[in-house]
Amino acid sequence: MLADKLGVSFCETSDNGTGDEHVEVIHDWPSQHTKIGTKEKVPSEVTYQKQGLIWGSLIPPNVQRHMWTKLQLDPTQKGEMVKIVREVSTSSSQEPNKQPVEIIADFLAQVKAHLIKNLDQKFGKVLWRTLDITLVVTVPAVWTEVAKARTLEAVDKAGFNAPEFPQLKKIVMTTEPEAAAIYTIKSLRGMYDAYSWSYSRVVASNTPIQKHSYGLQDFLLHLQ
C-alpha cells in the first residue's frame, strides 16, 4: 500500500511493503545543501527556472516559487487564497499560465519519481512491480467534491496510474481525520471487541457521525 499526503505546506509519502503492519515513511528527501534530507516531510513547493523545475527543499532561499497551491483546488477557498497569496506567496511571476492542477501534478511527479527510486532500492526494480498496489490519497475533511476531483486529476497527471504502477488495483481517497482513525483502529486490532461496541453505539443515532462511521467501515473493507 502506498500513502500520499499532500499538505498545504508539506508533503509526506509512505509504504507498508507487502501488507505487513510496519509503515515506512520516506526520510531521504533531496535537499539543496546536502542533497539528502532527513525529515519525514518535503515542502509542497515548486519553482520554474531556466534550467527546469526545482522542487521541495532543493529550492534555494529567496527564489520565487509556487506555494500553498493546494488551497486553489477548492473554489470555496478563493477569497482566502487571494489573501494568502498577497501575504505569503512570492509566485506572482512564476508561469502565469499554469493552472493549480498542473502545478500540483508537476510537484507530485517529482514525489512519484523519488518514491519509485525508494521502491527500487527496497524491493528491486522487478519485484515491487509485481505486487498489488492500493494508493491512498488523503484530503482535508472540508474538501468539496470539486476539490476532490481536481486532486485526483493532479494525482493522475503526475503519473500515479497503471502505466507507472502496473499492479495498481485501486485509488482510495479518504479525509485526513478518517485516515488517522483508521491507523488507530488497525493499531488496536487486538481490541476488536471494544471497537465493535463503540461502533454500534455511534451508529445508533441519526447524526452526521453515523454517516462518517459507515464511510469509515466501507474504507476498512477496501483495505482488507
Residue spans of the language-model regions?
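Gly/Thr-rich phosphate-binding beta-strand-loop-beta motif of the actin/hexokinase/Hsp70
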Residues: 1-24, 188-224
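Short acidic, glycine/serine/threonine-rich loops at helix termini
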Residues: 10, 148-151, 183-186
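Conserved beta-strand elements of beta-rich interaction domains across eukaryotes
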Residues: 13-15, 51, 76, 142-144, ...
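Phosphate-binding loop and its immediate beta->loop->alpha context
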Residues: 19-156
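Phosphate/ATP-binding catalytic cores across multiple sugar-kinase/actin-like superfamilies
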Residues: 106-126, 180-207
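Short helix-terminating capping/connector loops at secondary-structure junctions
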Residues: 122-132, 163-168, 205-209
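Extended hydrophobic secondary-structure segments that form protein cores and membrane-embedded regions
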Residues: 129-140, 170-175, 212-216
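Conserved phosphate-binding/catalytic loops in two-lobed NTP-binding clefts
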Residues: 159-179
